[in-house]
Amino acid sequence: MGKRREIIIVSNRGPVTYQHGLERVREAKRGGGGLVTALGSLATHHDVTWIASAMSDVDREIAEESGGQAVEERLANGSDCRLRFLAHEPSAYDQYYNVVANPALWFAQHCLWNLIREPDCERSGLMQAWREGYAPINAAFAEAALEELSRRPEAIVFFNDYHLYLAPRLVRARAPEASLLQFVHIPWPQLHCWRVLPEEITVAIHDGLLANDVVGFHTTRWRSNFIQSAQSVVGAKRVSGETAVSHIGRKTCLSARAISIDPDELAALVDDPRVREHERRIVETRPEYLVVRVDRTDPSKNIVRGFCAFELFLELHPELHGRVSMLSCLDPSRLNIPEYEDYVESIQREALRVNERFQRSGWTPIDLQIEDDVHQSVAGYKQYDALFVNAVYDGLNLVAKEAPLANERDGVLILSENTGAHEELGPFSLTIDPFDIRAQADAIYEALTMRADVRRRWIGDIRSWVREHDLAWWINGLLHDLESCLANGCEPDALGEEQKTVHDDG
């Protein structure tokens, strides 16, 4: 991991959130998602202060009791950090998270808008939410980061994701020499996807990001798109001979390093008794072939179109009726946002329609499980013959990296060309266009009928790649990129050099 550094992590969600248990005893629940796992591993090797939003009433109690200061926290991986909760004004946070971040920025960056009707920035109150929610919440994060920097002036400030595009500029204005790093965990689309948002927003986003010393993306594709949009939106200049741009007198190096997983942590989860119990049920009820998808109920995951593809597959191959099912383990996501709630209803309707058309005694084509159950998902990882990942766009997609390491059937990965993971794993998977239903149906059949030796070779290649390019590789690489940028500048092939450009569009 190199030398021990002081790092101030800044993210919307923190590593834990607190609830009251029996007799109102405070109980910590680990924060969800791969981001928490990735950032939490930093605390194992570095001196970490973590700034995050208070997500529960108990979190807010802790923030008040601590006077807004950081408190010592033991993370799930056994490492220690200082955790500072920010208790935001509820109305401002609602506008920040439920109007601007989701759906506006999420939909723009995943190219999800129905452009005939959306976005309607006036009726949605987007500009009001930007000014009264997103901007002040970012200012609160920046103020907290500056306070922590005053105690640890040599620390790296590590901003994360699309919730915090404005904070770096606010920190830079008052701490010109600070070391600032930001990683964008979702896709960075082409310029036309940004043009659907008001100019005030797109200019501020690009200006904020360019206050960092290094901005990281999962892929060269997303990085290339950022270079193009930064040049167009704020007039940034490409630095000759480097993978960097300059803006108002400051150079920002641009890194392309795909986040990854901790294979040891996944192996421990695979052996969990709760996973084995779910796996026992799957083995007892599964047909000859099992197609598995594991996703959040997010429109970007393309679940409804995936069910249409499975329906077409069944139309084309009646000989496989009763012999194949699709297990869909879906984690409910952002159901307080109308677009997400509507999408869950669409998922349920589509699964019901396909099942009513094809099911017969003892066979249900689509086994739809909508619940937050990581143990069921990992059991699905172990048992798939084909893993189906057809996201419209996805910054990376960690399922594509996790599942092959857990799988016990030499399963085949079917992977959307618009996922960040495709830049790494494309040679070892069946590539699909996420908008082409026939291509997806054909890929399911090809996966289930692939020669055994090819299946073994492909999944072995994925495992080797992921184990070599694991979470430690990602973290070490980002810190190296920052140190290199601050010391020597950034050469074209020095940042994320092991990843190759696959696409220049999207």
PLM feature spans:
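Catalytic cores of carbohydrate-active enzymes across secretory and cytosolic contexts
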Residues: 1-506
